[in-house]
Swiss-Prot record:
Organism: Nitrobacter hamburgensis (strain DSM 10229 / NCIMB 13809 / X14)
Region called Disordered, residue ranges: 1-24
The family this protein is said to belong to: Belongs to the ATPase B chain family.
Membrane-spanning residues: 34-56
Complex formation: F-type ATPases have 2 components, F(1) - the catalytic core - and F(0) - the membrane proton channel. F(1) has five subunits: alpha(3), beta(3), gamma(1), delta(1), epsilon(1). F(0) has three main subunits: a(1), b(2) and c(10-14). The alpha and beta chains form an alternating ring which encloses part of the gamma chain. F(1) is attached to F(0) by a central stalk formed by the gamma and epsilon chains, while a peripheral stalk is formed by the delta and b chains.
InterPro entries: ATP_synth_b/b'su_bac/chlpt, ATP_synthase_B_chain
A single GO molecular function term of this UniProt record: proton-transporting ATP synthase activity, rotational mechanism
Chief localisation class: membrane
Keywords linked to the UniProt accession: ATP synthesis, Cell inner membrane, Cell membrane, CF(0), Hydrogen ion transport, Ion transport, Membrane, Transmembrane, Transmembrane helix, Transport
PANTHER family noted in UniProt: ATP SYNTHASE SUBUNIT B, ATP SYNTHASE SUBUNIT B', CHLOROPLASTIC
Domain of life: Bacteria
Protein name as annotated: ATP synthase subunit b 2
Keyword RNA-binding set for record: no
Length: 185
């Protein structure tokens, strides 16, 4: 029957020497040590030459290409940043100029509208002053007419009162002078 390692019963492992004595680990055997060092040196030199002549230049080229691409992208980004900064400065200058022009236009328009409003106000004041003067003249003439009518009415009323009280008709000049004296105060 086979054991758990697949060996036939009674067979020994390849590292065991006959009689139960173990042989040293093969790479450390004195007989093969020098040839193993030479083989190892040849393998490392061959691996170094292959990698330094074939693989490493490709890796270096890939790294250099990647570095150049990154540097190019950074340079392009810096150029675009400089252009955008210049555009921003130009925009700010134009914006400031536009604000100044808008302020000037606003001031000019305000002054123009104020001048027009002053002109209209003065014309309106002049018309109102003329109407007021006309109204005052009308009031004065109406007052004068009313006062002259009041004198006549007062004279007529005084004459009628004196006639009622005394039964005789008073002198018209005397009544007019009495009314005039009482109106003057």
């Amino acid at each position: 029957m086979a054991d758990s390692h697949g060996n036939a019963k009674g067979a020994t492992a390849h590292t065991e020497a006959g009689g139960g004595h173990k042989a040293p680990f093969p790479p450390f055997q004195k007989d093969t040590f020098a040839s193993q060092l030479v083989s190892l040196t040849i393998a490392f030199v061959a691996l170094y030459l292959i990698s330094s002549r074939l693989a490493l230049p490709r890796v270096r080229k890939t790294i250099d290409d990647r570095q150049n691409k990154i540097e190019g992208d950074i340079a392009q980004a810096q150029t675009l940043k400089n252009e955008s900064d210049a555009a921003l400065k130009a925009y700010e200058v134009e914006l400031a100029a536009a604000r100044t022009r808008a302020q000037a236009i606003g001031n000019e328009t305000r002054e123009k509208l104020n001048a027009e409003a002053d002109t209209e106000r003065k014309a309106l004041e002049k018309r109102l002053s003329a109407k007021l003067a006309d109204a005052e003249k009308t009031i004065a003439s109406t007052r004068t007419a009313a006062m002259s009518n009041v004198r006549g009415i007062a004279s007529d009323a005084a004459t009628a009162i004196v006639q009622q009280l005394t039964g005789a008709m008073p002198d018209r000049k005397l009544v007019d002078s009495a009314v005039e004296a009482s109106m003057k105060g």
